[in-house]
Each structure stands twice: as structure tokens, then as C-alpha cells.
Amino acid sequence: MASSSISFSCAPSLATSLFSTTSSSPRLLSSRFLGTRNLKLRIRPARLGPSNGSRTTCWFKFGKNGVDAENAGIYGSQSRDDFDRDDVEQYFNYMGMLAVEGTYSKMEALLNLNIHPVDILLMLAATEGDRPKIEELLKAGADYSVKDADGRTAIDRANSEEIRDLILGYSTQKA
């Protein structure tokens, strides 16, 4: 995959909002947030934009020389203990389970069994067939053999053979 860098020009609508248009005197644009290279540039609101010679670039990079989400600690680098009850509730809401169930009683029942939140999330994700979430949770150390109140595991709750195979396949890769 080819690496690329991303650069932005300072948009007139953004920059003009930084200045008072009632004053006719030019002002200095020296924002570290915008990352402008020429900090001695005097800017009049009427001339603000890419044609004034200023250039703004992002301070983050993607691709070969950048950082991916997993190494940045954003996705996939969580451990079991990084998940808590709030994550279970947020996922329950996000996946529309509250709308379907009409109550938090099933979620609360799972939480009251003293099952670790990451294992509850795996059961819910398997029920929904949420492949990316299942992969994330298995990487974090979720245990697919934990049973719910009905004695069902994440494998039992999986909504398709593909999801069962994903969970079982991860367990054989890990071993």
C-alpha cells in the first residue's frame, strides 16, 4: 500500500470566523492548532484562503510512516480489564437491543451473574453477528466458554455458522 500524506488548505470560512470583520486592520494568524508555516503572514479577511501562500498540514500521518489505530491504542489494543459495565450498556444501546427488548432486564441479568464485562460483550456480539466487535473482544482476551444464565456460551449464542467458526477459529489460532 502506498504511503500518503494529507494536507489541508486553510478554508476561508474557518479562518474568517477567527477575525473581526468590523476592523479593517490586518491581524496576525499564529495558531498552533492550524499549524501554519508562515507565522509572520498578515492576513486580511477578504484575502483569506489558499491563494495567500499559507499552507496548513496535519500533524498526524497515515500509511507506512504513520501509526495505525491498533498501535496508537485506539482499537484492538485493549485488554480484558479495559472493558467495564458502561461498555456493556453502551453496546446494548448502540446495537438497538434496548429498542427490541424494551428494558435493560436481560443486560442486568448478565451483569448480576458476575460475568466479566468483556465476556458479556462477546455473548452480545455473537448474538448480533458483529464480526469486527467479536474480533476485537477475542484479541482483548474474552472467554468464549463463559456461560449465561441459560447455560449458553458465545458459541451457542452465535447467530450463524460463520460466527461460530470465527470464534472457534480464533481459539485454535491462539493455542
UniProtKB/Swiss-Prot annotation:
Give the GO cellular component terms, alphabetically: chloroplast; chloroplast envelope; chloroplast stroma; chloroplast thylakoid membrane
Cite the InterPro entries for this sequence: Ankyrin_rpt, Ankyrin_rpt-contain_sf, LTD-like
Report the gene knockout effect: Not able to grow photoautotrophically in soil. Pale green, slow growth and no bolting. No appressed grana in chloroplasts.
Q: What induces it?
A: Up-regulated by light.
Where are the disulfide bridges? Answer: none
Regarding the membrane, this protein is recorded as:
Peripheral membrane protein
Tissue expression per record: Highly expressed in leaves and seedlings. Detected in roots, but not in germinating seeds.
The alphabetized list of GO BP terms reads: granum assembly; intracellular protein transport
What Gene3D superfamilies does the entry give? Ankyrin repeat-containing domain
Spans of ANK repeats, please give: 117-149
Its predominant location is plastid
Keyword Magnesium among record annotations: no
Q: Which keywords belong to this entry?
A: ANK repeat, Chloroplast, Membrane, Plastid, Protein transport, Thylakoid, Transit peptide, Transport
Residue interval of the organelle targeting sequence: 1-68
Q: Is RNA-binding found in the keyword set?
A: no
Location in the cell: Plastid, Chloroplast thylakoid membrane; Plastid, Chloroplast envelope; Plastid, Chloroplast stroma
Which superkingdom is the protein from?
A: Eukaryota
Physiological role: Involved in the import of light-harvesting complex proteins (LHCP) and subsequent routing of these proteins to the chloroplast signal recognition particle (SRP) pathway.
Self-association or partners: how does it assemble? Interacts with CAO/cpSRP43, but is not a component of the transit complex. Interacts with LHCP (via T14 domain), TIC40 and TIC110.
The protein here is known as Protein LHCP TRANSLOCATION DEFECT
Give the organism, scientific name: Arabidopsis thaliana
Coding gene?
Answer: LTD
